[in-house]
């Protein structure tokens, strides 16, 4: 089971902007994920919870509001998805994360 992010890093203007990243499931089983941010004041992530089908991908949009330039990160926790799961947020609470992917985020002046 593997999950990768493409592109692997995010650079946005400190004045605000957005970046789209693709989570790619390189494995043969469905993955469930949850995204955590080191800065919830200036970044918005959509979706925070979700599924990625086997050999599939899911787009994640990172949006930054205006603020001081600084370095932050997203950490994507993932695990095999329960077979009967339809609500990612509810199902994630019942799984033990199997790994993480970190996306460094840089806000530039």
UniProtKB/Swiss-Prot annotation:
InterPro entries xrefs: Ig-like_fold, MSP_dom, PapD-like_sf, Sperm-specific_class_P
A UniProt-annotated Pfam family: Motile_Sperm
Ranges for domain MSP: 2-109
Tissue specificity statement from the Swiss-Prot or TrEMBL entry: Expressed at higher level in testis.
PANTHER family per record: MAJOR SPERM PROTEIN, MSP DOMAIN-CONTAINING PROTEIN-RELATED
Name of the protein: Sperm-specific class P protein 10
Organism: Caenorhabditis elegans
Gene coding for it: ssp-10
């Amino acid at each position: 089971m593997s999950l990768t992010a493409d592109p692997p890093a995010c650079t946005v203007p400190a004045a605000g902007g957005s970046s789209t990243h693709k989570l790619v499931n390189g494995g043969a089983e469905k993955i469930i994920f949850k995204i955590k941010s080191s800065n919830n004041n200036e970044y918005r992530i959509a979706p925070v919870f979700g599924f990625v089908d086997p050999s599939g991908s899911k787009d994640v949009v990172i949006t930054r509001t205006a603020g001081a330039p600084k370095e932050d990160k997203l950490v994507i926790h993932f695990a095999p998805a329960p077979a009967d799961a339809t609500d990612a947020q509810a199902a994630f609470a019942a799984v033990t994360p199997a790994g993480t992917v970190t996306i460094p985020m840089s806000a530039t002046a």
